[in-house]
């Protein structure tokens, strides 16, 4: 008789970034909407308490020091003055608070960007002060908005690549070559502007336009903030043929993003070229609450890379 040797199977170890993680939030909010003739004032006050806890993280290796509670009071004050329906300047000043979510606190393991992330259960919440100045208006044929803003964020939450002994301590020797951990930057500043318009050029024809830009600064390192979107301009057209059919087309232009973080990423953030995309679509409204839509995105199948889309690191198979 013959006896065969049983096959050898690979043994896989389950990966559990964290277990029994919870983020509990309680907020109390009051608001008053006041009218003084053409002046409308909106004031709000809010207090939040946020508590995070987990039984373990990093595949059960860490079981202590995982609880954190935070609280903050935030407020906003806005005013709109209606000179006419088409001319309504406004100003808004606000103070905001954001605590880390479950993933930012506890997830310990590989992510889609190719890095192994170490959990940060004691990460501090963000607080931000923002001022916004704008203009808006609308009537039967025209609707528009335009604004500029500036926001200063303390304890900004972001992921940073670690090297050397810091990477070994956070991610272990096996994952030290591609290790990141969420941390707080002391101060960052966002300065931006955006605008939007919708205009009925003729019967059943509407033209649309929107534009946005933002400049982020890492005030700790005096360089551009990591992963800021490129300037974007979008132009669109809608044509309602009758009560059932509508055709639309969009042209999106994205500017080259050359403002990249070099010191923070150790040269890991690259500039991305600009691009232009064309989308077209048709919608058939065959019932009051039902419709069928056919659309072609990126006509011509143009190759492009959005700056906020993270590519592979080169360590994947």
Question: Which residues fall in each region the model found?
Answer:
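Repeated loop/turn-to-beta-strand initiation elements of outer-membrane beta-barrel proteins
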Residues: 38-41, 86-89, 141-144, 203-207, ...
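Transmembrane beta-strands of outer-membrane beta-barrel pores
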Residues: 2, 36-38, 47-53, 93-99, ...
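Residues on the lipid-exposed face of transmembrane beta-strands in outer-membrane beta-barrel proteins
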Residues: 28-34, 77-81, 123, 133-137, ...
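Signature of Gram-negative outer-membrane beta-barrel scaffolds
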Residues: 1-88, 99, 110
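C-terminal beta-signal and adjacent terminal beta-strands/loops
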Residues: 97-98, 152-154, 159, 253-261, ...
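Gram-negative outer-membrane beta-barrel transporters
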Residues: 38-41, 149-153, 172-262, 300
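Membrane-embedded beta-barrel scaffold of Gram-negative outer-membrane proteins
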Residues: 82, 88-94, 122-185, 189-191, ...
């Amino acid at each position: 008789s013959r006896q065969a040797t049983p096959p050898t199977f690979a043994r896989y170890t389950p990966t559990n970034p964290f277990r029994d993680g919870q983020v509990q939030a309680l907020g109390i909010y009051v608001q008053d909407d006041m009218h003084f003739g053409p002046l409308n004032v909106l004031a709000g006050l809010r207090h939040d308490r946020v508590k995070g806890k987990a039984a373990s993280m990093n595949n059960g290796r860490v079981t202590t020091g995982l609880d954190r509670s935070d609280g903050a009071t935030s407020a906003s004050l806005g005013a709109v003055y209606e000179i006419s329906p088409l001319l309504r300047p406004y100003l808004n000043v606000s103070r905001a608070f954001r605590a880390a979510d479950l993933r930012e606190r506890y997830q310990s393991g590989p992510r889609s960007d190719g890095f192994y992330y170490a959990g940060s259960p004691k990460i501090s919440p963000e607080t931000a002060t923002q001022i916004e100045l704008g203009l808006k208006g609308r009537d039967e044929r025209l609707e528009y908005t335009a604004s500029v803003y500036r926001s200063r964020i303390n304890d900004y939450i972001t992921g940073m690549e670690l090297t050397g002994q810091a990477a070994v301590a956070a991610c272990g020797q096996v994952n030290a070559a591609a290790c990141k951990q969420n941390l707080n930057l002391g101060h960052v500043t966002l300065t931006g502007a955006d605008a939007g318009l919708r205009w009925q050029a003729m019967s059943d024809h509407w033209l649309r336009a929107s534009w946005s830009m933002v400049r982020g600064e890492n005030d700790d390192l005096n360089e551009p903030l990591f992963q800021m979107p490129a300037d974007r301009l979008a132009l669109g057209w809608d044509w309602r043929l009758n009560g059932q059919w509508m055709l639309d087309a969009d042209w999106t232009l994205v500017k080259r993003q050359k403002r990249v973080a070099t010191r923070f990423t150790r040269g890991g953030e690259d500039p991305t070229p600009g691009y232009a995309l064309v989308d077209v679509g048709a919608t058939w409204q065959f019932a009051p609450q039902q419709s069928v839509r056919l659309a072609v995105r990126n006509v011509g199948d143009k190759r492009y890379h959005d700056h906020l889309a993270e590519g592979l690191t080169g360590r994947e198979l």
